[in-house]
């Protein structure tokens, strides 16, 4: 059987940026990598209901900067910023260095593979029929402007005795084209029959400018300065 390489891993440095961006000496590398893992695990667990897409970690000069990409920034920030301050204190304690937390809003959650996968998993846990959940997510993505999407679920679908895999695709998903912007994510649904795995591939178009163009597009948009009002004479 043909095996598939990880769509994000093969594009790192070409059209996909890393989610941890820092340099470390050989003696500190493993400790910092494990620290990143602990921070991500903690934040993913704490923000389970906040529709978190990804967590980007940077380590400038004996500190840690965490950027949380979420479709529901209000849930992360909390009332008057109370929740985000608690998260900052917790991350500082876990990482052992001063922490800064930034929030980046995901404008189109229907085109984010992680949010789509988590949404399907959530529906499966609520006993929604898997075909209906898959089809609804695919149709929403295509309506918003996706070039193509593929969704795959595997496990004891519908409580069947024998586990199987089913998938649904619309549009084109060119996995071998390195300039293709493929967003890939996985999730798990914990049902009474066992775990059902969910995989999502979303093709957003081709990136001609390479990694610098992608990084420029991912930066939060700057607000235009307000024009001075003319005084009425």
Swiss-Prot record:
<dbReference type="InterPro" id="IPR004044">
    <property type="entry name" value="KH_dom_type_2"/>
</dbReference>
<dbReference type="InterPro" id="IPR005704">
    <property type="entry name" value="Ribosomal_uS3_bac-typ"/>
</dbReference>
<dbReference type="GO" id="GO:0006412">
    <property type="term" value="P:translation"/>
</dbReference>
<comment type="subunit">
    <text>Part of the 30S ribosomal subunit. Forms a tight complex with proteins S10 and S14.</text>
</comment>
<protein>
    <recommendedName>
        <fullName>Small ribosomal subunit protein uS3</fullName>
    </recommendedName>
</protein>
<dbReference type="Pfam" id="PF07650">
    <property type="entry name" value="KH_2"/>
</dbReference>
<dbReference type="InterPro" id="IPR009019">
    <property type="entry name" value="KH_sf_prok-type"/>
</dbReference>
<keyword id="KW-0687">Ribonucleoprotein</keyword>
<dbReference type="InterPro" id="IPR001351">
    <property type="entry name" value="Ribosomal_uS3_C"/>
</dbReference>
<keyword id="KW-0689">Ribosomal protein</keyword>
<dbReference type="GO" id="GO:0003735">
    <property type="term" value="F:structural constituent of ribosome"/>
</dbReference>
<keyword id="KW-0699">rRNA-binding</keyword>
<comment type="similarity">
    <text>Belongs to the universal ribosomal protein uS3 family.</text>
</comment>
<feature type="domain" description="KH type-2">
    <location>
        <begin position="39"/>
        <end position="107"/>
    </location>
</feature>
<dbReference type="InterPro" id="IPR036419">
    <property type="entry name" value="Ribosomal_S3_C_sf"/>
</dbReference>
<dbReference type="InterPro" id="IPR015946">
    <property type="entry name" value="KH_dom-like_a/b"/>
</dbReference>
<dbReference type="GO" id="GO:0022627">
    <property type="term" value="C:cytosolic small ribosomal subunit"/>
</dbReference>
<dbReference type="InterPro" id="IPR018280">
    <property type="entry name" value="Ribosomal_uS3_CS"/>
</dbReference>
<dbReference type="InterPro" id="IPR004087">
    <property type="entry name" value="KH_dom"/>
</dbReference>
<comment type="function">
    <text>Binds the lower part of the 30S subunit head. Binds mRNA in the 70S ribosome, positioning it for translation.</text>
</comment>
<dbReference type="GO" id="GO:0003729">
    <property type="term" value="F:mRNA binding"/>
</dbReference>
<keyword id="KW-0694">RNA-binding</keyword>
<dbReference type="Pfam" id="PF00189">
    <property type="entry name" value="Ribosomal_S3_C"/>
</dbReference>
<dbReference type="GO" id="GO:0019843">
    <property type="term" value="F:rRNA binding"/>
</dbReference>
């Amino acid at each position: 059987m043909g095996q598939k390489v990880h769509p994000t891993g093969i594009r790192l440095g070409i059209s996909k940026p890393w989610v941890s961006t820092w340099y470390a000496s050989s003696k500190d590398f493993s400790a910092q990598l494990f620290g990143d893992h602990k921070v991500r695990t903690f934040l993913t667990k704490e923000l389970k209901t906040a529709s978190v897409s990804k967590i980007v970690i940077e380590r400038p000069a004996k500190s840690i900067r965490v950027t949380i990409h979420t479709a529901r920034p209000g849930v992360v920030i909390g009332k008057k910023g109370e929740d985000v301050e608690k998260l900052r204190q917790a991350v500082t304690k876990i990482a052992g260095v001063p922490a800064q937390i930034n929030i980046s809003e995901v404008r189109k959650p229907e085109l984010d593979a992680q949010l789509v996968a988590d949404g399907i998993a959530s529906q499966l846990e609520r006993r929604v029929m898997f075909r209906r959940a898959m089809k609804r997510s695919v149709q929403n993505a295509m309506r918003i402007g996706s070039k193509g999407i593929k969704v795959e679920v595997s496990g004891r679908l519908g409580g069947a005795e024998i586990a199987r895999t089913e998938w649904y695709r619309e549009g084109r998903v060119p996995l071998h084209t390195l300039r293709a912007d493929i967003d890939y994510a996985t999730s798990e649904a914990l049902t009474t029959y066992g775990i059902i795995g969910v995989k999502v591939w979303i093709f957003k178009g081709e990136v001609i400018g390479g990694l610098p163009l992608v990084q420029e597009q991912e930066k939060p948009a700057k607000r235009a300065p307000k024009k001075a009002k003319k005084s009425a004479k």
